[in-house]
């Protein structure tokens, strides 16, 4: 889900190739507990790195969160990245996850929220606002990311939290 403007894919591919050439084995689509137990892995290896990322969205428990124009951040970022790699992405192509020409609001103050607002700017959204429940000084995301987003045209609305989605 990391946007290309933060980490270009060729850098990841180059680094992955170098690591593989140095003897590191990458095992993808592996399910601990199904493909092997954690104890089996511990017995077989000196060290184990589990880097799963956070792909389960936090639901906002307010009225209207089931409306058709509210999406989890990772769905949006993944679709945008895949499209950037040249993949066919139906939800992007049909306009569902493409923010071009749209008024966008992102709720949150972490780095994922900053990725969403900055990606929306790059997709030529009509406007982009970021709502965050605390003030700027207490945002969990990178201060540099906030400055970059502001310079790119994102409007921040501090001390704000939605009470209800209307449509």
Where are these regions (language model features)?
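Short, glycine/acidic-rich beta->alpha junctions
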Residues: 33, 109-112
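Short glycine/serine/threonine-rich phosphate/pyrophosphate-binding segments
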Residues: 111-120
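Beta1/beta-strand and adjacent pyrophosphate-binding region of the FAD-binding site
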Residues: 97-110
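Short glycine-enriched, charge-decorated loop/helix-capping segments at active-site entrances
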Residues: 1-6
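A Rossmann-like FAD-binding core segment of flavoenzymes
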Residues: 10-59, 71, 75, 81-94, ...
